[in-house]
């Protein structure tokens, strides 16, 4: 895959910051699934890497943790700060965190590392942040996510309209040498129509394409074509995601 344009990613999420919370059902469900895999213990210091507007940062802070919220997007961090979500705020790339090693009891990253150039580099950088005995918990999107979006667009053209994500084999390879508990699960989010489904992607900033944006405008007629071609489930237009979860403890 081509290198990730980090500035474009940050800009897409920045545009989504004011209304992100209205469209983040996937993020909430993914966070719930990751939370269920954490060991039952208290974490004094938490790094929320890819914090977005700070919903999970605020959860940890409300539970008595000292929280550092990190995001690539200045606008997302500004929203997190407005919500008083954390104790500290850092604008940075997950693959190059400007913090000293071994600071945190929990490093949390929910659906953020898929925007990195290298999963291996991102996870190693997050792992570097852990104190001995600390926990790294992360989720990312896996291959064959968003099949409905791809199928619907094929009725119109063959251009890429969704990012490609790593296969389970590639994910396992990137994490080889790291001990932890890894799992893959499927989450499906229903929408009333194709337009609502696509608005949800825009609403969370997940519209940046690593391979470049298709140039054609979404006209009313194309939207009607998408609606007709979208695979339906009980009358709804779903978006299906394959979520890879990793939980590791540093020796």
From Swiss-Prot:
Reaction it catalyzes: malonyl-[ACP] + S-adenosyl-L-methionine = malonyl-[ACP] methyl ester + S-adenosyl-L-homocysteine
UniProt key word Transferase: yes
Which terms are listed as keywords in the entry?
A: Biotin biosynthesis, Methyltransferase, S-adenosyl-L-methionine, Transferase
Q: In which pathway does it act?
A: Cofactor biosynthesis; biotin biosynthesis
Which GO terms label this protein's molecular function in UniProt? carboxyl-O-methyltransferase activity; malonyl-CoA methyltransferase activity; S-adenosylmethionine-dependent methyltransferase activity
Q: Which GO terms describe its biological process?
A: biotin biosynthetic process; methylation
Q: Looking at its record, which EC class is this enzyme?
A: transferase
Identify the NCBIfam families for this entry.
BioC (TIGR02072), PRK10258.1 (NF007610)
**Role summary:** Converts the free carboxyl group of a malonyl-thioester to its methyl ester by transfer of a methyl group from S-adenosyl-L-methionine (SAM). It allows to synthesize pimeloyl-ACP via the fatty acid synthetic pathway.
Name the chain's protein.
Malonyl-[acyl-carrier protein] O-methyltransferase
Classification of source organism: Bacteria, Pseudomonadati, Pseudomonadota, Gammaproteobacteria, Enterobacterales
């Amino acid at each position: 895959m081509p290198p990730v344009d980090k500035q474009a990613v940050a800009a897409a999420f920045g545009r989504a910051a004011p209304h992100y919370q209205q469209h983040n059902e996937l993020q909430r469900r993914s966070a719930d699934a990751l939370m269920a895999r954490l060991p039952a213990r208290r974490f004094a210091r938490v790094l929320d890497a890819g914090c977005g507007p700070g919903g999970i940062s605020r959860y940890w802070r409300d539970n008595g943790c000292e929280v550092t919220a990190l995001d690539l997007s200045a606008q997302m961090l500004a929203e997190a700060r407005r919500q008083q979500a954390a104790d500290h705020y850092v604008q940075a790339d997950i693959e190059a965190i400007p913090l000293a090693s071994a600071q945190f009891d929990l490093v949390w990253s929910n659906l953020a590392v898929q925007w990195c150039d290298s999963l291996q580099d991102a996870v190693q950088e997050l792992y570097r942040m852990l104190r001995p005995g600390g926990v790294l918990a992360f989720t990312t999107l896996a291959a064959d996510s968003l099949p409905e979006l791809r199928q619907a667009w094929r009725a119109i053209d063959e251009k890429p309209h969704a990012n490609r994500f790593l296969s389970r084999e590639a994910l396992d390879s990137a994490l080889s040498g790291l001990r932890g508990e890894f799992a893959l699960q499927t989450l499906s989010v229903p929408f009333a129509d194709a337009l609502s489904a696509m608005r949800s992607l825009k609403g969370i900033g997940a519209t940046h394409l690593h391979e470049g944006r298709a140039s054609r405008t979404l006209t009313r007629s194309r939207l009607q074509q998408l609606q007709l071609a979208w695979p339906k489930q009980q009358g709804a237009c779903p978006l299906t995601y394959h979520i890879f979860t990793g939980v590791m403890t540093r020796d």
